[in-house]
C-alpha cells in the first residue's frame, strides 16, 4: 500500500473519498440491484440506505479537504464556540487557542461545538 510511504492528510482524505464514492455509486448500487432482481426488496432497501450513508461520508471527506486547502479548519469567518475534545474547555472566537489553557492539549483537539441537544 503506497509503496510503504505514509501519505499526507489530504491524500488520505482523497483516497478515503474515492473509496466511499465507489461504495455508494457501484458496490451498494449493484448489491441493491441484485437483491431486487432476486425478490429481496427489504435487503435492496437496506443496501440503498447504506449507499446514502456512504455518499454522506464522501461529502464529509471532500469538505474536510476543502477546509484544509482553504485554511479554514481552525479559522472561521465569525465567532463560534470551540470545544476541547480532551477536557471540554469552551473557547469563543474565530479560532481556537493554539494550546488548551486547561489541559495543555494542542489546537488539533478543538472542534466547533455542536449544539444539537437544544
Predicted feature descriptions by range:
Residues 1-118:
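Non-heme di-metal
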Amino acid at each position: 500500500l503506497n509503496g510503504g510511504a505514509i501519505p499526507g492528510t489530504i491524500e488520505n482524505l482523497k483516497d478515503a473519498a474515492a473509496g466511499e464514492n465507489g461504495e455508494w455509486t457501484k458496490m451498494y448500487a449493484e448489491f441493491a440491484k441484485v437483491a431486487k432482481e432476486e425478490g429481496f426488496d427489504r435487503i435492496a432497501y437496506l443496501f440503498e440506505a447504506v449507499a446514502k450513508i456512504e455518499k454522506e461520508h464522501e461529502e464529509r471527506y471532500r469538505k474536510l479537504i476543502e477546509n484544509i486547502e482553504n485554511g479554514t479548519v481552525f479559522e472561521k469567518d465569525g465567532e463560534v464556540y470551540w470545544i476541547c475534545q480532551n477536557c471540554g474547555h469552551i473557547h469563543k472566537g474565530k479560532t481556537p487557542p493554539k494550546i488548551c489553557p486547561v489541559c495543555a492539549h494542542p489546537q488539533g483537539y478543538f472542534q466547533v461545538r455542536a449544539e444539537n441537544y437544544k
